[in-house]
Amino acid sequence: KAYIYPEYLPERDRDTTMFNTIEYYDKLLTEANFPHIEMTKWFKTMKDTLPYPIFPTMDNHWQFTSVYAYDSLFRFMDNLKHFGIPKIKYGEPQAYDLKFQSDEATLNLLFPVRDKSTDYKLDVEIECNDSCRKPQVLFVGDSFIWALNEQLPWEKLMEDIEIWFYNSDVYKGFDRKPYKKDDINMLRDMLKADYIVFYTSGHLWHRATYDFVEQALLTLCVSDSLMEVESIRIADSLGISKEEAIAKIKDYPGMIRGIMNCDNPSIRNE
C-alpha cells in the first residue's frame, strides 16, 4: 500500500534512498528470463484512472482490486503452459459499507473508528468449458493470498490448492487444513503441483523468498548421498564441522558443485 500511495506517508517515513527493491528484483528476474509479473507499476497507473481506491482506507491489504491481479496472474500462468485454466469474469465494482474492517483490529484502539471508508465488491464468475482444466497450485508467500479465497470462488478456478504461508505454516486444500512445514513432504508437494507461485509485497522483499528458493534447490537437486559428500568436502576445505557445513549449504546452496547447472531437477527421484 505504501508503494502505491507514498504521498500519504508521514515525511519521516518517505523513501529517500536511491535503491528500490522492486525494481532491483524485477530487473534481475527479467535478465534471467524467469517468468514473473511485477504488479506495482500497474496499480500505480490504475490509481489515477480508476474511480475507486486501489486499497481501502482502513485496510493494509487489497480487496476487490485483487481480482484484477489474480485474473492477470492466472492468464499469465495459462500462457506459460497452455494449460486451459478457467477464465475469470467480473463486472463493475459495487459499493458497500463495512461495519468492521479487518485491520482495524490490529490498531488496539479504545473506540472503533467512526468514519469508515466505503469498500467495493466485484461479482465474479468462473467460465470453464469442456476443454478447460483446473490446475493444482502451490502458493508460497505472504498474507495477500487470502483475498483469493475472499474475492473469488477458488474451488471453481483450481483443482486443489496448497499455501506455504511465509514458507513456514502450511495450509492444504480449500478448507485450509493446517500443517507445520517440517511435517510435510516438500518434494512430493512441489512435484504434484501444476504451478508453483511465489509472491511477495514490496515491503517484504528484504526477506527475499523466505528461504523457499534455497530449500527448493536442495530438495529438487541434491540427493542425500550428494549432501553427505559435499558437506564433508566443504567442512574439510573451510576447517569447520560437518554440521556447520550443512548450515552454510542451506543458506548458500550454490556451494554444492554443479547445482547451478541442474537442468533436470529430478535427482531426488532416482
Sequence positions of predicted segments:
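Extracellular glycan-modifying ectodomains
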Residues: 1-270
